């Protein structure tokens, strides 16, 4: 099969001891005889993942898989929501965060759907919302963490340091507490995810990528 993978660091693979990635997912699929093109880049936002997919002819591939990342990354990549972050003395509330989140994930699905080709979505850094209303998006794995840990429920809104850390003074206290609470949920998972996840508690290790590649290969049979 000709397989296309797009995403952020979750699509790249897992880290070795010196900080490089071995691109495990594509490697394991190649070992099974598949021809794999991997467009994933660490730190990519959903918009950047979408743009990477636009650089290739999707019809040349039998299957296209895209890792869905934290929608708040688009605040940085496209300088969105300056009305909240750049206005002096404006305090961002939890209501604002919810509004931004709903707009961001909805817009990202519309982007991916506009490619007019079946995209098998994988919830990596962020869990997928319902996508039944789209024409071309398939919810292949809504949440990798929930796939490995059946008792775990991934939070809807997740603190992401590259976005929120530089803007903490803009949030009210209740919103800051909420964001850190979701972050602590991730940190607490580090103690139980060691079998399949890298020590950072976020990314799959080689064993996790091997299982994920097996799930993908089984689906493509």
For every predicted segment, state its role.
Residues 54-206, 210, 214-221:
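Alpha-helical cap/lid subdomain in secreted, periplasmic
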Residues 1-47, 211:
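Serine-esterase "nucleophile elbow" of acetyl-processing enzymes
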Residues 47-55:
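Metal-dependent catalytic neighborhoods of phosphoester/phosphodiester hydrolases
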């Amino acid at each position: 099969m000709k397989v296309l993978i797009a995403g952020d660091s979750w699509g790249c693979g897992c880290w070795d001891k010196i900080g490089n990635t071995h691109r495990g997912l594509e490697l394991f699929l190649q070992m099974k005889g598949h021809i794999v093109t991997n467009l994933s880049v660490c730190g990519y936002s959903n918009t950047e993942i979408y743009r990477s997919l636009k650089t290739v002819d999707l019809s040349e591939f039998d299957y296209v898989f895209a890792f869905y990342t934290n929608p708040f990354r688009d605040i940085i990549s496209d300088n969105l929501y300056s009305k909240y972050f750049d206005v002096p003395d404006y305090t961002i509330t939890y209501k604002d965060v919810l509004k931004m989140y709903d707009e961001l994930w909805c817009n990202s699905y519309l982007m991916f759907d506009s490619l007019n080709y079946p995209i098998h979505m994988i919830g990596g850094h962020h869990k997928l919302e319902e996508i039944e209303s789209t024409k071309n998006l398939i919810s292949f794995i809504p949440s990798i963490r929930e796939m490995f840990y059946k008792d775990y429920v991934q939070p809807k809104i997740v603190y992401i340091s590259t976005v929120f850390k530089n803007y903490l003074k803009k949030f009210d206290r209740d919103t800051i507490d909420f964001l850190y609470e979701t972050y602590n949920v991730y940190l607490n998972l580090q103690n139980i995810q060691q079998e399949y996840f890298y020590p950072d508690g976020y990314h799959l290790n080689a064993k996790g990528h091997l299982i994920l590649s097996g799930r993908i290969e089984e689906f493509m049979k």
